[in-house]
Amino acid sequence: MPSVRSIEDYFGQIESLLYRQDWTNGEKISKFVSTYDEHAQEPFMHIEAYGSRSKRCRVSEDEVFDEIVCLHLHVLYNIHVAQDLITAQSTQIQIIQLFNKEILQKRKDENWFLPIFYRLCTDLRWLSKGAEACVSGDDEGDSNANSFFESAAKAITECYRTCVSDVHAEEGTTKKVAMLNMTNQLFQIYFQINKLNLLKPLIRAIDNCGSLYHDFLMSDKVAYNYFLGRKAMFDADLNLAEKSLLYAFRNCPADSMSNKRKILIYLIPVKMFLGHMPTSQLLHEYRLDEFQDVVAGVKDGNLAQLDGALAANEAFFIKCGIFLMLEKLRMITFRTLFKKVSQIVGTAQIPLDAFQTALRFVGVTDVDMDELECIIANLIASKKIKGYLSHQHQKLVISKMNAFPTLSGVSSN
């Protein structure tokens, strides 16, 4: 896209693009209303209330876009001059409400403008995050922060309702193709304010969208499966999490290393719970060496190594939101160690003392007999070990057939 040399040039370029209203030009125009495009950094673009001036440039081709552009300039003014992200965020909501009322609702037989709408929604999320940071030090910071995200979600949801109610079925004109992008926008907002329960009807709508799914952009499908996989992971639905995250990873472009890395941060723990350990080479390739000792500890049944790895990389795992899940790998690690003990003992009746000896050998000295019995009972209850505890004889009696079934074939809880 050519650089913007002046405010007159800015309006002129938009007007020329509006002469041909197709998806390609919609993508080009979207950059002109982005708060992160190069033009947004130019001082001559930071104009307060430009739309109220009597002498000004205009998008004469389209009055609605003229108003949107003027509001966009006001957003830029509040970001760069007034440094008022709260007003910038509320103005961005005005833009989206205007877009919904005058474009999504009234322009029935076209959808070329959806790339512009996607950009406006993405910027609204970022402005909401910025507004949140502005009030985070206030006494009522948390509630105010949530209100920014909630107002953003409300504006996007209103547009979502408009698009899903579109009766046109053809790919070239239906606004229903915006469903997935808007679902992704709302996924990110609800993750931010911890209201994932509000996503259920949106997920159900995608599940039931039929052949329309093939018309969605692959980039939106990748993002959706990434978010769906994360939600499924936190819901302890490991099979759905694995399926979704694998789809996202395999369909993410090979040169998008940072995005593939983000997907792996959640896919790796899911795979580990299902008994599939990542290779050291994979972890190194995607700069995820924080997992190296975690994986080694789980594979070797070494509780001390696992605990040490979690402690050493606690800040990273907490930032990613997976620390508590990784802590639950202790049960898998206990299982690995107990499987090794059973192989050494070589009988179906294993004294509990043998497990305690093994625990002490790997540096775990704070597990008494009662806690050991509780750990084994939980492993049996979750079907990770086939057998039963004989409290009277202080032994674990394991099944002679497949006493330690594959983790992918048992309950994930």
UniProtKB/Swiss-Prot annotation:
Residue span, PCI domain: 222-403
SMART domains in alphabetical order: PAM
Annotated GO CC locations: transcription export complex 2
Family matches, as Pfam families: PCI
Family to which this protein belongs: Belongs to the CSN12 family.
GO biological process: poly(A)+ mRNA export from nucleus; post-transcriptional tethering of RNA polymerase II gene DNA at nuclear periphery; transcription elongation by RNA polymerase II
Signal peptide start and end residues: none
GO molecular function: double-stranded DNA binding; RNA binding
PROSITE patterns listed in its UniProt record: PCI
PANTHER family: PCI DOMAIN-CONTAINING PROTEIN 2, UNCHARACTERIZED PROTEASOME COMPONENT REGION PCI-CONTAINING
Protein name: PCI domain-containing protein 2 homolog
